[in-house]
From Swiss-Prot:
Domain of life: Bacteria
Keywords from the UniProt entry: Cell inner membrane, Cell membrane, Chaperone, Disulfide bond, Electron transport, Membrane, Oxidoreductase, Redox-active center, Transmembrane, Transmembrane helix, Transport
Membrane-topology annotation of the record: Multi-pass membrane protein
Subcellular location: Cell inner membrane
InterPro entries: DiS_bond_form_DsbB/BdbC (IPR003752), Disulphide_bond_form_DsbB (IPR022920), DsbB (IPR050183), DsbB-like_sf (IPR023380)
Job description of the protein: Required for disulfide bond formation in some periplasmic proteins. Acts by oxidizing the DsbA protein.
Residue ranges annotated as Periplasmic topological domain: 26-43, 82-136
Protein name: Disulfide bond formation protein B
A molecular function GO annotation: protein-disulfide reductase activity
Segments crossing the lipid bilayer: 9-25, 44-58, 64-81, 137-155
Homology family: Belongs to the DsbB family.
GO CC entries: plasma membrane
C-alpha cells in the first residue's frame, strides 16, 4: 500500500508539473502571453505538484499535504472557472487591472519572470485545442487533479476506520 500511495502522489505531481510545462511551451513556442489569471492557475498547478511531492516524502503528514494540494486545486478551479466565464461573455474583460499589477509585484514574478510575469489579456482569443479553450483545459485538469486527491483522501479515511 505504501508504494502505491507514493506512486499515486508522484503521478499527481508529474501531471501538475506537466501542465506548467505545457503552459510554458504555449508561452514560448506558440507566443501566447499569460494573463494574470493564467499565472494564478500556474500557481495552483505548482501548489498541487509541490504538496503531492511532500506527501511522497513526508508520510507522517501526508493528509496535511494532500489537503493543501486540494486547497491549491480549489483555488485554481475558481480562477479557471472565472476565466472561462470571462471568455463566454465577450463584453467582459479583466483588462489591465490591479490584479495584473499585484501578480507582477509578487516575489515570484521578480525571481522567475519567465514563468510568473503576466503580460497578456485574460480575454485574448487563443486557438482552441480539441475544441476547447486553454482555460477550459486548465479547469478540466484542475478538477481531475483535485478530485483525484479528494478520492484518495476518502479512500484512506475509509481504510483506517
Amino acid at each position: 500500500m505504501q508504494a502505491n500511495s507514493r506512486t499515486y502522489f508522484l503521478l499527481i505531481a508529474i501531471v501538475s508539473f506537466a501542465m506548467v510545462g505545457a503552459a510554458l511551451y504555449m508561452q514560448y513556442a506558440e507566443n501566447l502571453q499569460p494573463c494574470p489569471l493564467c499565472i494564478m492557475q500556474r500557481f495552483a498547478f505548482i501548489g498541487i505538484g509541490i504538496f503531492s511531492l511532500l506527501a511522497v516524502i513526508a508520510q507522517n503528514t501526508r493528509t496535511l499535504w494532500q489537503g493543501l494540494g486540494m486547497l491549491s486545486g480549489v483555488g485554481g478551479i475558481a480562477v479557471a472557472g472565472y476565466q472561462v466565464a470571462l471568455l463566454m461573455n465577450p463584453k467582459a474583460s479583466c483588462g489591465i487591472d490591479p490584479l495584473e499589477n499585484w501578480v507582477n509585484s509578487l516575489p515570484t514574478a521578480k525571481l522567475l519572470p519567465q514563468v510568473f510575469y503576466s503580460d497578456g489579456l485574460c480575454t485574448a482569443p487563443t486557438p482552441p485545442i480539441l475544441g476547447l479553450s486553454i482555460p477550459a483545459w486548465s479547469l478540466i485538469w484542475l478538477l481531475i487533479l483535485t478530485l483525484t486527491l479528494a478520492v484518495g483522501l476518502i479512500r484512506r479515511e475509509k481504510h483506517f476506520r
